[in-house]
């Protein structure tokens, strides 16, 4: 059984010194929140829209935000009887009125539209929602968020630093963020873990023993079964698993991060050293040492938000791997990367080239009808090198249709399940890059990704 060391208090203090918001930061945040709330009210009055209330939600409203992060969630709530059409039309009208004072504005879409703005250096989401009586009566997914605020705020009071430590620890391990690109832990989930276990330290110790199917049910709802690796029943809505976005790999990465940290608690688990981009010479050295085949399918990045793009990229990744395996290529690993202009689906194969000949195994000779049909088909076929019997079965050595992975992908990629926007982009044009050709991709973030890849 593994023996873990304690977590030095001085280490926690050192981390908190770097992540606790300063008093000037707090004052600025509160001032911006008040400004935004006032502007929403003024906009509603100006547009003649009654019954609108403003609620600040998220980590900024709960005191669990990390220094240097400037995210504010402003919920523009409408009476429950408001129609969805009016919610979207009137809510966005108010948001756009507020956005007149912003440096930048961008329409975004979850279950319904909302507006993301940059306001005095803060990243602000202006989100219309229905004002319902309880989270069990929500009319759209965002309606439950104000109830999260009401549940967490009184219970987390006095434990805000524990949440900050857990968030930064998850960041250091690459598992923080519930967006579909990351598939990690959300801010709300980290808060619930601290509420459940009482502290950062207790959460870390508990996670060391987690297994897939781990269930946390703070309010003892226990009504619905979920199949995700970690199940954290939403205290405000017993039908929902707060950890539904967490992938198995990120779940296990967090467990491993906790175990390694407790063996040797260090600042680097919170603040890992920056990863440097891979230089061309290093790429060539790694290719030479690995002796495998690196392939990248490169195409123009679709103009959609990441939460739409990345599920499609992961779908493409799986489909391409399945295609390669179908044609006898051995896939070591796959991955995806997306930048502002180009996107790459990465594959590493044991070899990108196979022999021209393929051993095709037929039925046993004694299965007369099937065996004779098999023999007749391949005896008369073109591209057959010869037939014989081995272990009681007919064997024909036939010409392989795709001896190279590049040729296979160039010919069959569009037959894969790619997702709507990715399919459109790939259909407009794609490039297969192999081995040293990867040096063509110069984007800084890609070279950082590549260092982790190979």
UniProtKB/Swiss-Prot annotation:
UniProt-annotated binding residues for ATP: 59, 62, 148, 167, 176
Keyword vocabulary terms for this entry: ATP-binding, Magnesium, Metal-binding, Nucleotide-binding, Nucleotidyltransferase, RNA repair, RNA-binding, Transferase, tRNA processing
Catalytic function, reaction form: a tRNA precursor + 2 CTP + ATP = a tRNA with a 3' CCA end + 3 diphosphate; a tRNA with a 3' CCA end + 2 CTP + ATP = a tRNA with a 3' CCACCA end + 3 diphosphate
GO molecular function: ATP binding; CCA tRNA nucleotidyltransferase activity; magnesium ion binding; tRNA binding
Gene3D superfamilies, per database record: Archaeal tRNA CCA-adding enzyme catalytic domain, Beta Polymerase, domain 2, CCA tRNA nucleotidyltransferase, domain 2, Poly(A) polymerase predicted RNA binding domain
Pfam family, one: NTP_transf_2
InterPro entries reported for this sequence: CAA_C, CCA-adding_arc, CCA_tRNA_nucleotrans_2, NT_2-5OAS_ClassI-CCAase, NT_sf, NuclTrfase_I-like_C, Polymerase_NTP_transf_dom, tRNA_NucTransf2
Keyword set includes Nucleotidyltransferase: yes
Ligand binding (CTP): 59, 62, 148, 167, 176
GO biological process: RNA repair; tRNA 3'-terminal CCA addition
Cofactor(s) needed by this chain: Mg(2+)
Binding site for Mg(2+): 71, 73, 125
EC number, UniProt record: 2.7.7.72
NCBIfam families: cca_archaeal
Oligomeric and partner information: Homodimer.
Anything else known: A single active site specifically recognizes both ATP and CTP and is responsible for their addition.
Entry's family note: Belongs to the tRNA nucleotidyltransferase/poly(A) polymerase family. Archaeal CCA-adding enzyme subfamily.
Known function: Catalyzes the addition and repair of the essential 3'-terminal CCA sequence in tRNAs without using a nucleic acid template. Adds these three nucleotides in the order of C, C, and A to the tRNA nucleotide-73, using CTP and ATP as substrates and producing inorganic pyrophosphate. tRNA 3'-terminal CCA addition is required both for tRNA processing and repair. Also involved in tRNA surveillance by mediating tandem CCA addition to generate a CCACCA at the 3' terminus of unstable tRNAs. While stable tRNAs receive only 3'-terminal CCA, unstable tRNAs are marked with CCACCA and rapidly degraded.
Name under which the protein is recorded: CCA-adding enzyme
The organism of origin for this protein: Methanosarcina barkeri (strain Fusaro / DSM 804)
Lineage of the species this protein comes from: Archaea, Methanobacteriati, Methanobacteriota, Stenosarchaea group, Methanomicrobia
